[in-house]
């Protein structure tokens, strides 16, 4: 209880007439300074900052629009590229097929020419062998009489040429 009394006494000694609910002159001075600073900030600081923020927002909107436009252009270019590549692949495929057909025709033509040449060569060789066989046959038939007479003479020991002419 002694402490409570000393704090009340100390409060009375410090000028007991001041009430914290009633503002004194410093409050109004501080309030006036605050309002002046607030007015200065509102007049000279906020408009340039607002202008910069508005410009930045406009720049961001323009950048976003440019990005969308660029994305559309890229998509269009990609679609055009894909279409061109598909056309080129189709054309290359048709050219390749035409080349295969032409190659097969050339091979077939060369094969036909080669078959004709082989047939001619075989026919020529057959004729040549037939002629050689006929020549050998006539030669052998002409020499058969002489050889048979010689062989008969050797086997019999008698000259057959003179007896065979009768």
From Swiss-Prot:
Protein name: ATP synthase subunit b
Location relative to the cell: Cell membrane
Organism: Mycolicibacterium vanbaalenii (strain DSM 7251 / JCM 13017 / BCRC 16820 / KCTC 9966 / NRRL B-24157 / PYR-1)
InterPro entries per the UniProt record, alphabetical: ATP_synth_B-like_membr_sf, ATP_synth_b/b'su_bac/chlpt, ATP_synthase_B_chain
Keyword Ion transport: yes
GO CC terms in record: plasma membrane; proton-transporting ATP synthase complex
Subunit structure comment from the entry: F-type ATPases have 2 components, F(1) - the catalytic core - and F(0) - the membrane proton channel. F(1) has five subunits: alpha(3), beta(3), gamma(1), delta(1), epsilon(1). F(0) has three main subunits: a(1), b(2) and c(10-14). The alpha and beta chains form an alternating ring which encloses part of the gamma chain. F(1) is attached to F(0) by a central stalk formed by the gamma and epsilon chains, while a peripheral stalk is formed by the delta and b chains.
Family: Belongs to the ATPase B chain family.
GO molecular function: proton-transporting ATP synthase activity, rotational mechanism; proton-transporting ATPase activity, rotational mechanism
Keyword annotations from UniProtKB, A to Z: ATP synthesis, Cell membrane, CF(0), Hydrogen ion transport, Ion transport, Membrane, Transmembrane, Transmembrane helix, Transport
Keyword check for Zinc-finger: no
Membrane-related topology note: Single-pass membrane protein
Region (Disordered): 124-143
Role played: F(1)F(0) ATP synthase produces ATP from ADP in the presence of a proton or sodium gradient. F-type ATPases consist of two structural domains, F(1) containing the extramembraneous catalytic core and F(0) containing the membrane proton channel, linked together by a central stalk and a peripheral stalk. During catalysis, ATP synthesis in the catalytic domain of F(1) is coupled via a rotary mechanism of the central stalk subunits to proton translocation. Component of the F(0) channel, it forms part of the peripheral stalk, linking F(1) to F(0).
